[in-house]
Regions:
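Helix-coil boundary and interhelical linker segments in multi-pass alpha-helical membrane proteins
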Residues: 688-697, 763-789
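Membrane-helix interface motif
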Residues: 260-267, 758-775, 843-846
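Generic alpha-helical transmembrane segments
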Residues: 708, 753, 789-806, 831
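Conserved cytosolic headpiece of P-type ATPases
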Residues: 1-730, 735-738, 795, 812-882
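Core segments of transmembrane alpha-helices
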Residues: 676-680, 745-757, 833
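Alpha-helix capping/termination and helix-coil
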Residues: 604, 656, 660, 755-767, ...
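Membrane-water interface at loop-to-transmembrane-helix junctions
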Residues: 732-752, 781-793, 821
Length: 882
């Protein structure tokens, strides 16, 4: 509000007193389910129910064997193993969910830190929304979210969207009791927390904060919606179903095969058969637990959460989880100019005022026909509000004019707020007994409203504008009129009188960000099309395009640039024919951006769009990824998926790189997990037919599951992003997550591992091997089963084959060596945990893991011989690279 400075606001003592009495402006989150209740919820899983039933039966048999047959305490190892299976299957998923919740918790508190303009101790200041207290005097402008409940003190054309509270999209707010709407849910001078200013500006006094607001009374913890089903989600569901069906079939074959083997090779005894049948069911169920990728969704969530946290360090605040991976599939970026491509550091480059107009008229017009403020923080002036208007206030200060003194001295009687449709704003000012109308806006609009052209011609003004615009400068036109009588000047947000006098033009520069040309080139090399959508003139927009190497005068033509008016005139058919060729839309309006997004989507493009204003919300919601700016309005941020904190286009390029790298990391995890699935399922299936004893016990398979689901997810999710992904073209949405090269790797590696392990299994079952050095020297004889030492060898060889294969999975599609560890400290640490864990299990696990300690020379043989897996991978990568 131009003359709102006469409010003193609260002082420091009053602020502290109000905060103690009325509390802070933060909503208390709704109570969540307790951790215990969430953990118990995991036991509703059908697989866990089967494990619980099997565990109870196993415990009953163990009690019978211990008390009835006096077989000793070792009989309880099986039920303890089942208990471990249950705790692992439930505990890991529970832990990952809690971890993911903590990763996302910060995102749901971001709004409490949104800046709010207040008057305190007679000075305009900016404070976080959480610090607003009862009694604060708050400025509100178009696009703002009301920070707390309060009363409107002054307002100009204020319309508020109360749909989040009452369902009413537009409610007019006023301080005039004669204009109050008797049918409104809340009085017309009351403003409610969480509602949004769609038009106008004003001043309000806070009357309630936090839980005492109307919004707080009906508040339920509003979490970010991460339920959007993306192509990746659908592919993962399909992959999970495919693996699940295969594992169920293999489990059924194991049960049938082992029962058939028992009935044909052992004299039937009910107690023995019951024990054997229970063991068979346990093997089948455990195989399902291992094979079914119940950890896959959580592993993806962990990867997303990990990426979200690290993307924040590159100025990308991800609000909606799916946007992480969708950015990697983006094919078109529709970007604003101001603040995104440019520095948004507006400064008046030059002014051209015509005629013999007194300076005080120009100064009054700039100071009073404005909603911007200047805030002095540590001797540095900061613009609060529109940066273009702020540049004009700074220009006044350079000339020794105190804009705040003018606002104290004069009164704004009527106003028309700026809108993208009108492209101008106007104020009727009463000062020193004079009444003056001031108009400011797009020069061509303002000039057309003037009767007195101050000795200029349209051609002269157009030439002047073209000169500035060709230097990528923003231009504003100014006009005024002295009002002689008391007639109403503004009617229905329209100037009702004529005879305006043209004052002149101000050219305002906003340099291109230094890192933007390289960032634009990077995303274009990545196969992504960049389009500029701006409210500036064609000349200004084209010059910015030249500076960032998007526009080339030698190759581009009028087919590649269009104005908002021309864009609107295109029918849908013509638009679809032209839309891919359009590089720049100048003088664009908000709905032009939304229509552009929808047209591109119709052609199968994946669109990311930037926006910072309230009117950008439709386009931000329509795009696959909406990118709001850090200093954008609350409405824009709420409609977006990612907030670019520093407003820079370079950060958008970083988001694309993260999205593509994230997708690759998920592919690597699936590559590793699916290979282990194939090997484990085939080994257990064949083992059931080759002998009565399963080569992998319940507890051993659960360790494999821990490696496969949790450790591998953590290791591969922690891999840093790769710059090389920006050399690839965007992936097609229809591409299955397991591509042909992955299938070759999975099937080739899986079948090779199976062949090696099944030969070893057969050899172990038909010899009395006591050291791996005996391989080749012992004669294969009759079936003898597996000794504890042979079981330990087989289990360790199986694990270390997967261990080395994890290095191959990590190096997949990177073009780098599996031993390139720069930036991969997390991967190295987890690999060491797996290796040390296996050594401890074999040496200390005893009967619980059904293992015995392995000789040192056998450890060396296993580690060296299984490492051939990674050396073969290195050789294949070297061949592919050359």
């Amino acid at each position: 509000m131009s003359n709102a400075k006469h409010y003193d606001g609260l002082d420091r003592e009053e602020i502290d007193s109000r905060r103690r009495e009325y509390g802070t402006n933060v909503l208390t989150p709704a109570a969540k389910e307790s951790l215990l209740k969430r953990f118990l919820g995991k036991f509703k899983d059908p697989l866990i129910v089967v494990l619980c039933v099997a565990g109870a039966a196993s415990l009953g048999i163990s009690f019978y064997e211990y008390f009835g047959l006096h077989l000793g305490g070792t009989v309880f190892f099986e039920p303890v193993g089942i208990l471990m299976a249950i705790l692992l299957a439930t505990g890991i998923g529970f832990w990952l969910e809690v971890k993911a919740d903590r990763e996302f918790a910060i995102l749901n508190q971001v709004n409490d830190d949104q800046p709010v303009q207040v008057i305190r101790s007679g000075q305009v200041a900016q404070v976080p929304r959480r610090d607003v207290v009862v009694g604060d005097i708050v400025f509100i402008n178009t696009g703002d979210e009301i920070p707390a409940d309060g009363l409107l003190l002054e307002g100009v054309s204020i319309n508020v969207d109360e749909s989040s509270l009452t369902g009413e999209p537009i409610c007019h707010k006023t301080t005039d009791p004669a204009l109050f709407d008797s049918d409104a849910t809340y009085p017309s001078n009351r403003l409610m927390r969480g509602t949004k200013v769609m038009e106008g500006h004003g001043v309000m006094e806070i009357t309630a904060v936090g839980d005492r607001t109307e919004n707080g009374k009906v508040f339920t913890a509003a979490q970010i919606d991460n339920s959007v089903k993306t192509p990746l989600d659908r592919q993962l569901v399909g992959l999970g179903k495919m693996i699940s069906r295969a594992s169920y079939c293999i489990a059924a074959l194991i049960v049938i095969g082992r029962i058939a083997m028992f009935l044909t090779s052992v004299e039937f005894d009910w107690i023995t058969f019951t024990t054997f049948f229970l063991q068979t069911i346990m093997i089948a169920v455990t195989l399902i637990v291992v094979a079914v990728p119940e950890g896959l969704p959580m592993a993806v969530t962990l990867s997303l959460a990990f990426s979200m946290r690290r993307m924040l360090k590159t100025n990308n605040l991800v609000r909606k989880m799916h946007a992480c991976e969708t950015m990697g599939a983006t094919t078109v970026i529709c970007t604003d100019k101001t603040g995104t491509l440019t520095q948004n550091r507006m400064q008046v480059y030059k002014t051209d005022f015509f005629g013999n107009i007194p300076d005080n008229v120009i100064y009054e017009g700039i100071a009073l026909n404005s909603t911007a403020q200047l805030d002095k923080i540590e001797d540095k002036l900061t613009v609060l509000g529109n940066p273009t208007e702020g540049a004009l206030l700074l220009w006044l200060l350079e000339r020794g004019v105190d804009y705040s003194a003018l606002r104290e001295k004069c009164k704004v009687a009527e106003e028309i707020p700026f809108s993208t449709e009108r492209k101008y704003m106007a104020s009727v000012v009463e000062c020193d007994g004079r009444k003056t109308l001031y108009v400011k806006g797009a020069p061509e609009i303002v000039y057309g409203m003037c009767q007195d052209k101050s000795g200029t011609t349209k051609e002269q003004v157009d030439l002047l504008l073209a000169n500035y615009q060709n230097q990528a400068m923003r231009t504003l036109g100014f006009a005024y009129k002295e009002i002689e009588d008391s007639s109403q000047v503004i009617v229905d947000n329209t100037i009702s009188i004529g005879g305006l006098v043209f004052l002149g033009i101000a050219a305002i520069s906003d340099p291109v960000r230094a890192d933007v040309p390289a960032a634009v080139e990077e995303v274009r090399n990545a196969g992504i099309t960049v389009k500029i959508v701006t409210g500036d003139t064609p000349g200004t927009a084209k010059e910015i395009g030249r500076q960032i190497n998007l526009w080339n005068d030698a190759t581009d033509s009028q087919d590649n640039i269009i104005t908002g008016t021309e864009f609107e005139a295109l029918n849908d058919k013509d638009l679809l024919q032209r839309v891919r060729d359009i590089k720049i839309i100048a003088r664009a309006r908000p709905m032009d951006k939304k229509r552009l997004v929808e047209a591109l989507q119709t052609l199968g493009e994946v669109v990311a769009v930037t926006g910072d204003g309230t009117n950008d919300a439709p386009a931000l919601k329509a795009a696959q990824v909406g990118l709001s700016m850090g200093d954008g309005t609350s409405v824009a941020k709420e409609a977006s998926d990612i907030t670019i904190i520093d407003n820079s286009f370079a950060s958008i390029g970083r988001a694309v790189m993260w999205g593509r790298s994230l997708y690759r990391n998920i592919q690597r995890f699936i590559l590793f997990q699916t290979t282990v699935n194939i090997v484990a399922c085939l080994i257990v299936l064949c083992g059931a037919f080759m002998g009565l004893q399963s080569p992998l016990t319940v507890t051993q398979m659960l360790w494999v599951n821990l490696i496969m689901d949790t450790f591998a997810a953590m290791a591969l999710a922690s891999l840093p992003p790769s710059e090389k992904v920006m050399n690839d073209k965007p992936r097609s949405q229809s591409d299955f997550i397991i591509n042909s090269s992955m299938w070759k790797f999975i099937l080739g590696t899986g079948l090779l591992f199976f062949a090696v392990l099944i030969v070893l299994l057969y050899y172990f079952e038909h010899t009395d091997l006591t050291s791996l050095q005996q391989i080749g020297s012992l004669t294969v004889g009759e079936f003898k089963g597996l000794s504890p030492y042979e079981l330990s060898l087989f289990f360790t060889i199986f694990v270390f084959l997967q261990f080395w294969n994890m290095f191959n999975a990590r190096a997949f599609a990177t073009g780098k060596s599996a031993f390139h560890f720069k930036g991969c400290s997390g991967f190295v640490c987890i690999a060491l945990v797996i290796a040390l864990g296996q050594i401890l299990i074999v040496n200390c696990g005893g009967e619980f893991f059904n293992v015995v300690p392995i000789r040192l020379d056998d450890w060396i043989i296993i580690i060296l011989s299984t490492s051939i897996v990674v050396w073969i991978g290195e050789l294949l990568r070297l061949i592919a690279k050359s």
